[in-house]
Amino acid sequence: MSKVSRDTLYEAVREVQAGSISKRRKFLETVELQISLKNYDPQKDKRFSGTVRLKTTPRPKFSVCVLGDQQHCDEAKAAEIPHMDIEALKKLNKNKKMVKKLAKKYDAFLASESLIKQIPRILGPGLNKAGKFPSLLTHNENLNTKVDEVKSTIKFQMKKVLCLAVAVGHVRMSEDELVYNIHLAVNFLVSLLKKNWQNVRALYIKSSMGKPQRLY
């Protein structure tokens, strides 16, 4: 991350954390990386999207639901992870409101191999529209590990506007954890951009209720 010095990064993180201590909120504030782009035409240039796994889960309350076959539902039940089987999904009967409610209830979904292909047919396009189409869950993976992976993965997606924001942590993480996550996120984002740093107008970090701190 050549353009943002370690000192700048640590200083910004300290400011964000100090701000959240001086005004304690009733909820755990998320720390967000805000990106403003330049020399980019969302109409003409390729809209990028990509995911990167951070070292520390940015949102501890991030909820994942398993849409599973029998084995995955049993594993999820044992691990106290929310889950639904194919019968429960069929009961939603493609009802748009119910599917929307399901998409709103959880932050992400995992689906067994046997179910994932059937989801558009059983649920319609609701999860996809909400940007929450399930990730694949196979039987060679440990369910808890996979859930942790989903919880620590963030997604950059270029839409029609020249600014983006992603969660990179929360205010009670250590300085080092936050710095590491921000470092990973910024480097990954810059690698997605056509002209790398030449496409970056500004970078800020801020907590949910705090003031933005400029990094670049």
UniProtKB/Swiss-Prot annotation:
Any Gene Ontology CC annotation: cytoplasm
User: Do you know which SUPFAM superfamilies this protein is assigned to?
Assistant: Ribosomal protein L1
Name its GO BP terms in alphabetical order: translation
Is-annotated flag, keyword Ribosomal protein?
A: yes
InterPro entries linked? eL8/uL1-like (IPR050257), Ribosomal_uL1 (IPR002143), Ribosomal_uL1-like (IPR023674), Ribosomal_uL1/biogenesis (IPR028364), Ribosomal_uL1_3-a/b-sand (IPR016095), Ribosomal_uL1_CS (IPR023673)
Q: Which PROSITE patterns match?
A: RIBOSOMAL_L1
* Subunit structure, as described in the record: Component of the large ribosomal subunit.
Record PANTHER family: RIBOSOMAL PROTEIN L7AE FAMILY MEMBER
This protein is called Large ribosomal subunit protein uL1
Protein's organism: Ictalurus punctatus
Lineage, highest ranks first: Eukaryota, Metazoa, Chordata, Craniata, Vertebrata
